[in-house]
Amino acid sequence: ATIVHMHVRDENGHLTNDITQFKRTISLIKDKCDILIEGSTGGVSELSVEERGFVISLPEVEISAINMGSVNLGEAAFVNEPEDIRIWAKMMQDYNVVPVVQCFEPGMLETVRVLKEEGVLKLPIIYGIPMGFVGSQPSCSVNMQYMVNLMPDNAVWYFQQHGMRDL
């Protein structure tokens, strides 16, 4: 499957939760491509938990990224508190959206395990492994292999490279 992971920005370049902007962007993409739309609860921003999660309710969103913890991205702290993660996971269940659990570092894979045990995360789950962000895990085969080794057998996962720095 081909997936587009999207964050929508307003005319000033700021992250937005404007439903009109999202629907317009999704329409422009779908007009040109047969592609899965991956929403996201992410984005370094001042949006509230509800504002960050609204994309999950859009019928065009079939899968959505959900970050499994907090991480520094460059000079910004990307805060994802455990209770917020639970709220978004429950929304995904309610709207039948498949979670893409974004694990920036090994401890976040443990969070996935715990949330599965609690019943907060249910299968199917897709694992996203973002690497190469300044302030996060560098991209290299050793780090990738370690992350894959920590995943459950038969896990569905993908790698996400930020920039060209580590390639």
Segments from the language model and where they lie:
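Short beta-strand segments at enzyme active-site cores
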Residues: 2-11, 37-40, 102
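Alpha-helix-loop-beta-strand connector modules within alpha/beta enzyme cores
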Residues: 14-40, 87-94, 145-155
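Catalytic alpha/beta core domains of metabolic enzymes, predominantly
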Residues: 61-167
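A short acidic, glycine/proline-enriched capping/turn motif at secondary-structure boundaries
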Residues: 43-46, 70-72
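Glycine-rich, proline-tolerant flexible connector loops at the mouths of alpha/beta enzymes
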Residues: 3-25, 73, 130-131
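Short, acidic/polar
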Residues: 1, 47-57, 166-167
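Acidic-and-aromatic substrate-binding clefts and catalytic sites of carbohydrate-active enzymes
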Residues: 14-15, 44-48
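Short, electropositive alpha-helical surface patch
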Residues: 16-33, 53-63, 114-128
